[in-house]
């Protein structure tokens, strides 16, 4: 079954557009495996978007998980291989939660139909499905796979990853769980959590990955508030975020492609060598920060306004705080330490033409949507009555940007990136996995070998071997003996009868005559 309405169409529109742009961005890549994985991944996202039942959704959901991991593995480094395995493990677990929820829901309702779920009718099945969706939406503490795997993906693979998995999760949450208040609270916390890590991170693509958690927080919060304006805001932000976040990943990827470096502490002073990439990266930075006349301005504030209209003052405060962190980490820190800052001595060439064309199209979309928001608003699931370009919204945005800029200048030395590792929730499952393996090898394995193994040997293995020996004797002596005896008897009599067949007519005549006399004798006497 399929589901085609304004909600699915707006996501399908941006997924298709971004797939085309990233394919253009990756034209220089001579790796058929990577391209195949990317196309399957994009196709899976569209399959989920148009799924009208949970069976179809689950099939394409798993297609996304198993195809996207190859975009990490194809970088072919030890870190990317390990990150890919962790990524796959987490998504397989999430898929099992989703599958369990789907099966349980079918048992409860007798239907696989995919549609809205009422907060009052929350059941075990709904809870399991929600966990599966939230994992793909990178809801803390289930978010570590994103900041772990995305920075280790290939240059072009990271751009694909930034566009699909998490935004598909936003779509299914908006479709099924709009109005769940717990999501509004979780989303606001996500928004702040992500920018905190983005502000202290050193790796450029990991900054963007952490900040993606923050932006997803806005979307999840909008879905949780559940009003028409809030859902419109979540969808609009998902659409624009795919555009400008993709542009930022393209810019950071181009720098990695041309310099071989992604850590801010290893970069700096390259603005004169890659001016076009610099322009495109700054465009993405100001757009994601919500500058007027950019895509971020006409989408992000819609969710904040929706929170204010529903009198969620604390949520609104957290979202505004996250906006400050966004401009600080991605709008200022990221471009400054990549392009300016101290001179790293690197003299890279400009990125290939196809990369520039893809970034140019995406940058154009950032400005086009900001200048002409009606293009996006007409695609949103509900009528839009909110106007971004009011004196209040403009003054609010400019004050936020101005004072954040002043703060960046004041605390510039404190924000200078250092080559260090930041501990996140992935530490627990990394350490937990090691502890589990140690427990399994040192305790469980010994118990299994010394105790369970002996029980298995005495109760199962030896009796089975004894029965097998008896069956073997029966098979060879009785079954095979009977069959072989019949065969041997036939061969013996065949040999005797063969002696009679001499080929001479007089012998046959004598035998026939003797036979005749024997028959007559038997009849008469």
Predicted feature residues:
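Hydrophobic core of alpha-helical transmembrane segments in multi-pass integral membrane proteins
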Residues: 16-23, 99-102, 192, 362-367, ...
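Alpha-helical transmembrane segments and their membrane-interface junctions
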Residues: 287-302, 363-382, 456-460
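Hydrophobic transmembrane alpha-helices and their helix-loop junctions in integral membrane proteins
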Residues: 21-32, 36-57, 67-354, 371
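Alpha-helical transmembrane segments
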Residues: 23, 334, 405-417, 519-523
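Hard-cation-handling environments
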Residues: 351-404
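Aromatic-capped, Gly/Pro-kinked transmembrane alpha-helices
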Residues: 378-393, 415-525
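Hydrophobic alpha-helical transmembrane segments
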Residues: 2-15, 125-133, 316-324, 391-408
């Amino acid at each position: 079954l399929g589901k085609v309405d304004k909600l699915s169409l707006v996501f399908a529109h941006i997924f298709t557009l971004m797939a085309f742009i990233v394919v253009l961005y990756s034209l220089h890549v001579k790796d058929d495996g990577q391209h195949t994985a990317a196309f399957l991944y994009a196709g899976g996202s569209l399959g989920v978007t148009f799924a009208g039942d949970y069976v179809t959704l689950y099939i394409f959901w798993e297609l996304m998980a198993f195809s996207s991991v190859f975009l990490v593995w194809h970088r072919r480094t030890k870190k990317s291989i390990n990150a890919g395995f962790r990524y796959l493990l987490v998504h397989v677990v999430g898929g099992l939660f989703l599958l369990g929820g789907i099966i349980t829901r079918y048992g409860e309702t007798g239907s696989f139909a995919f549609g809205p779920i009422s907060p009052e009718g929350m059941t075990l099945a709904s809870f399991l499905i929600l966990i599966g969706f939230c994992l793909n939406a990178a809801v803390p503490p289930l978010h570590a796979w994103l900041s772990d795997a995305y920075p280790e993906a290939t240059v072009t693979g990271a751009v694909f990853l930034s566009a699909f998995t998490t935004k598909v999760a936003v779509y299914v949450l908006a479709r099924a769980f709009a109005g769940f208040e717990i999501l509004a609270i979780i989303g606001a916390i996500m928004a702040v959590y992500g920018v905190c890590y983005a502000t202290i991170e050193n790796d450029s693509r990991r900054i963007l990955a952490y900040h993606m958690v923050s932006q997803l927080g806005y979307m999840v919060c909008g879905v949780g508030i559940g009003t028409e304006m809030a859902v419109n805001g979540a969808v609009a932000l998902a659409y624009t975020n795919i555009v400008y976040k993709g542009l930022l990943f393209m810019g950071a990827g181009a720098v990695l492609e041309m310099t071989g470096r992604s850590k801010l502490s290893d970069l700096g002073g390259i603005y004169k060598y890659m001016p076009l990439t610099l322009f495109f990266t700054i465009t993405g930075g100001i757009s994601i920060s919500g500058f007027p006349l950019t895509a971020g301005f006409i989408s992000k504030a819609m969710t904040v306004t929706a929170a204010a209209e529903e009198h969620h003052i604390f949520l609104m405060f957290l979202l505004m705080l996250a906006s400050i962190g966004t401009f600080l980490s991605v709008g200022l820190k990221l471009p400054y330490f990549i392009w300016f800052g101290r001179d790293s001595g690197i003299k890279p060439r400009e990125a290939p033409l196809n990369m520039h064309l893809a970034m140019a199209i995406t940058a154009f979309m950032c400005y086009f949507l900001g200048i002409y928001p009606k293009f996006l608003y007409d695609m949103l699931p509900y009528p839009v009555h909110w106007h971004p370009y009011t004196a209040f919204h403009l003054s609010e945005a400019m004050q936020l940007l101005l004072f954040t800029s002043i703060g960046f200048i004041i605390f510039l030395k404190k924000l200078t990136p250092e080559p260090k590792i930041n501990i996140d929730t992935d530490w627990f499952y990394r350490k937990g996995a090691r502890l589990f393996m140690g427990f399994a090898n040192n305790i469980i394995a010994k118990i299994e070998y010394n105790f369970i193994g002996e029980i298995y040997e005495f109760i199962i293995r030896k009796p089975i071997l004894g029965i097998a020996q008896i069956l073997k004797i029966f098979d060879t002596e009785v079954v095979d003996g009977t069959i072989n005896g019949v065969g041997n008897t036939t061969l013996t009599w065949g040999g005797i009868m063969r002696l009679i067949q001499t080929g001479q007519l007089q012998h046959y005549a004598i035998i026939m005559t003797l036979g005749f006399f024997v028959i007559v004798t038997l009849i008469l006497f």
